[in-house]
Amino acid sequence: MGEASSPAIAKDVTELIGNTPLVYLNKVTDGCVGRVAAKLESMEPCSSVKDRIGYSMITDAEEKGFIVPGKSVLIEPTSGNTGIGLAFMAAAKGYRLVLTMPASMSMERRIILKAFGAELILTDPLLGMKGAVQKAEELAAKTPNSYILQQFENAANPKIHYETTGPEIWKGTGGKIDGLVSGIGTGGTITGTGKYLQEQNPNIKLYGVEPTESAILNGGKPGPHKIQGIGAGFIPGVLDVDIIDETIQVSSDESIEMAKSLALKEGLLVGISSGAAAAAAIKVAQRPENAGKLFVVVFPSFGERYLSSVLFHSIKKEAESMVVE
């Protein structure tokens, strides 16, 4: 992963994962006293941070002898991006992959998963990720040679962020980072990346991000929201809650508006959870005590995956009603 076998040509698609760029946010940060740089996980080979764990969970299971290409059936509940991270890996390695996903996730996700040859089963959106997890467990019980990768419980998830994302951010900022801002889905990114960064400098602050509508880490109740990929409605096993200094709440509407602003003002087309993370990072960077500090925010996915979602609803209608001039 990330270390090409020849100076210029990668051995296969797995060597393209990681080493994503960092870029300053310049206009949406008006009024901030701290600086904000985005880690563009939207520039992974399959356009999301989940490419890292798709690689790590499959590789880890192979090394432990739990799965064998051509024989094992991989099963996983997903909100979409982990499914895509697993699907391109499964295609490259020759695995049958069965995914369960809430029906509320974007149409692009369904199409991309099928394009990679994954089998997809939709679950009741009202049951959220819990419903997808239950369905995956049912399928595994009746499918021979099946293996659930369990992104919410799998130690290979935070481990890859500890080994790659954390060091990349530390190196990319020259060790000058003061805080990390990351949305919490499985919790793998903030747990692994955060652990590495705090080992380098214990003063680095870790800020989680969750939907206002499902603010369970702040003691609220799980509820429906529009920020695909974060706010699973339960506390995942891989999330180390003790490592987090503060979990910031951002509403679905705030997240959508910020994602739109990032495209219009920064030239960055990103998903709704990136909007949530950016909105949280800006709140932190506006605090007087953070003057001159550098915050890195993780942008988990590319905006094109959300064309059918509420993020682009008004633009889609406008585009569909256009006429030849």
Swiss-Prot record:
Alphabetized, the UniProt keywords read:
Amino-acid biosynthesis, Cysteine biosynthesis, Cytoplasm, Pyridoxal phosphate, Transferase
The residues that hold pyridoxal 5'-phosphate are N81, G185, T186, G187, G188, T189, S273
Which superkingdom, per the lineage?
Answer: Eukaryota
User: GO annotations under biological process?
Assistant: cysteine biosynthetic process from serine
**Modified positions (N6-(pyridoxal phosphate)lysine) in chain numbering:** K50
Q: Which coarse location class applies to the principal site listed for this UniProt protein?
A: cytoplasm
Which family does the UniProt entry place this protein in? Belongs to the cysteine synthase/cystathionine beta-synthase family.
Q: How does it assemble?
A: Homodimer.
Query: What name does the UniProt record give this protein?
Result: Cysteine synthase
Give the originating organism. Triticum aestivum (Wheat)
